[in-house]
């Protein structure tokens, strides 16, 4: 059997008025008594998760970690945090589409 890593608790939140979903994963650290999180964004029609925040440390407990993660994502959304990543992703997709067009027309 291959060795696996427990990725802990994961939630997803659909961002209002967009085609994007944010995933947040949290792993509990016994050493610091905190959760270490990773934040990803994905457009619904593309299967690639894009890491946007790595190793945010969150003080919480097992019974409320999901709620606390949802609160964190909501706070970030209300401050416009995800706008940059959405704009960047849209730009990358346009560049990719243009590259495909160039390659297809070269043949």
Label for each model-derived stretch:
Residues 17, 43-47:
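Solvent-exposed strand-loop boundary residues in beta-sheet-rich modules
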Residues 25-31:
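Short beta-strand micro-motifs enriched in acidic
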Residues 33-37, 47, 63:
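Hydrophobic residues embedded in beta-strands of well-ordered beta-sheets
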Residues 48-107:
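Mixed-charge, Lys/Arg-enriched low-complexity segments
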Residues 13, 23-24, 35-42:
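Short linear proline/tyrosine/threonine-rich motifs used for host-factor recruitment
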Residues 1-19, 25:
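Negatively charged, low-complexity tracts enriched in Asp/Glu with abundant Ser/Thr
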Residues 11-14, 41, 91, 95:
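Short, low-complexity interaction segments enriched in Ser/Thr/Pro/Gly
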Residues 5-8, 31-36:
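A short, compositionally biased
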């Amino acid at each position: 059997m291959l060795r696996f890593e427990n990725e802990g608790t994961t939630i997803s939140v659909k961002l209002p008025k967009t085609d994007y979903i944010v995933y947040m994963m949290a792993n509990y650290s016994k050493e610091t008594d905190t959760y270490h999180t990773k934040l990803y964004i994905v457009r619904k029609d593309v299967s690639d998760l894009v890491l946007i925040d790595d190793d945010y440390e969150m003080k919480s407990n097992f019974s409320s970690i999901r709620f606390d993660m949802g609160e964190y994502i909501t706070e970030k959304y209300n401050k416009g945090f995800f706008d940059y990543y959405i704009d960047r992703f849209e730009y990358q997709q346009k560049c990719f589409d243009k590259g495909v067009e160039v390659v297809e027309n070269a043949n």
